């Protein structure tokens, strides 16, 4: 009888393991432009690991961020809603907690976040890196469904990409929880290593699937990278462009954007990011969970092309127009793809999709309960991914940005409908139709 009981228990345990839901990781990159990857057309940056992963994915050529700056897009990912619906209209400024820059200062407790949805479904959830939708006082990842959090600075950028990831004086940009590093360590490496540690711990325990958001601060300012990689791209810049001067493209409000990618330090940051994506994929292979893991790769807004206080312009979004902070394509078009080996076939999808679609898509892919009253604006992309539909039949996409910002734009809204796009500047009462 004991033998029968043991066998039955073993069968039940195996059945439970077989029925376990797939793991999920969202690689959420900061300020990554649509043309910053080789698979999206970059000739200057080198991203072989990301390109290889994208080639195995459902790859979206018409993916948009929910806003042209970070905090609203991040709120949209967490809620499955337009950011303006939950009060996020611009990036948060931790030095002005009264709500300057945005109508909201944190995610409302009434929202069932994507973290809470996966927690309720039995996942072990982790969040590492850039958060920027609240602070210790008003809601960090652990208050929104994540069992484990690490390195979530109050600010939207790190004080430094080099250990100890702090400024000389205490700052809201100081990155916490990474004190066990050493001089010379690089932040993108540290975040990835800690994230892989969370994955290994969860897999070794064997009790739960994992849901992890790996929120890289890269490639946001400050533009910093190891010297040897910077030198590599300085040489590449000379080979590619010689003494040909950089062309600057005029933009509204007396702004200009670069017509080509040529920043060696930014290129070095990109290579570091790429190597770390490769490191995550290798970890999945070594753990034997590759076919049990969904990878979402995306960005929070378009690439930053304006000079600002950190020196030279990080990147160029050409042939897209303008930059992060603008509602033209360069400010809101982003690279996005979803990988699940053995389940999602390699395909390219041109239908316009947006950040808030990720939440309902992952619920459907993992077999978790759909939350239509929560994800009221997002649409599941599963029919597109599996080729069951060519379109979502969505009436339009909309962007609302009632602010000026350091990237040069003015209060602006935009609507995308079919192949038409309308951009309206509120204070100037000027409308453009493309």
Question: What is each residue range found by the language model?
Answer:
Residues 1-4, 24:
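N-terminal export leaders
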Residues 65-90:
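Active-site nucleophile/metal-coordination loop of metallo-enzymes that catalyze phosphate/sulfate
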């Amino acid at each position: 009888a004991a033998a029968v009981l043991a066998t039955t228990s073993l069968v039940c345990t195996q059945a439970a393991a077989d029925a376990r839901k797939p793991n999920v990781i969202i690689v959420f990159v900061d300020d990554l432009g649509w043309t910053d990857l080789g698979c999206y057309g970059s000739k200057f940056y080198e991203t072989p690991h990301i390109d290889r992963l994208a080639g195995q994915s459902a790859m979206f050529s018409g993916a948009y961020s929910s806003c042209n700056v970070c905090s609203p897009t991040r709120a949209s990912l967490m809620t499955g809603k337009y950011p303006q619906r939950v009060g996020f209209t611009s990036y948060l400024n931790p030095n002005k907690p009264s709500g300057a820059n945005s109508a909201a200062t944190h995610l409302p407790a009434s929202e069932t976040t994507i973290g809470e949805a996966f927690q309720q479904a039995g996942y072990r959830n982790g969040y590492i890196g850039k958060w920027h939708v609240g602070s210790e006082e008003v809601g960090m990842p652990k208050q929104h469904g994540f069992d484990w959090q690490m390195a979530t600075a109050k600010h939207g950028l790190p004080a430094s990409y080099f250990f100890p990831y702090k400024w000389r004086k205490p700052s809201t940009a100081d990155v916490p929880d990474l004190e066990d590093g050493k001089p010379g360590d690089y932040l993108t490496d540290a975040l990835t290593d800690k994230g892989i540690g969370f994955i290994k711990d969860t897999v070794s325990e064997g009790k739960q699937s994992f849901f992890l958001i790996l929120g890289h601060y890269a490639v946001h300012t400050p533009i910093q990278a190891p010297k040897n990689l910077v030198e590599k791209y300085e040489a590449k810049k000379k080979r590619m462009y010689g003494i040909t001067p950089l062309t600057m493209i005029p933009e509204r409000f007396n702004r200009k954007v670069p017509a080509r990618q040529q920043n060696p330090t930014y290129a070095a940051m990109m290579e570091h990011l790429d190597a770390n994506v490769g490191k995550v994929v290798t970890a999945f292979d070594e753990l034997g969970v590759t076919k049990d893991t969904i990878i979402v790769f995306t960005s929070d807004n378009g690439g930053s092309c304006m000079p600002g206080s950190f020196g030279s312009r990080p990147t160029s979004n050409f042939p897209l127009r303008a930059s992060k902070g603008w509602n033209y394509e360069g400010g809101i078009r982003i690279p996005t793809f979803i990988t699940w080996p053995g389940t999602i076939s390699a395909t390219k999808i041109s239908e316009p999709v947006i950040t808030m679609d990720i939440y309902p898509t992952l619920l459907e892919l993992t077999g978790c309960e759909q939350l239509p009253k929560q994800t009221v604006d997002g649409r599941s992309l599963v029919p597109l991914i599996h080729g069951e539909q060519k379109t979502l039949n969505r009436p339009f996409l909309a962007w609302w940005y009632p602010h000026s910002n350091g990237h040069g734009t003015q209060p602006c809204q935009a609507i995308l409908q079919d192949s038409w796009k309308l951009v309206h500047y509120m204070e100037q009462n000027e409308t453009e139709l493309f």
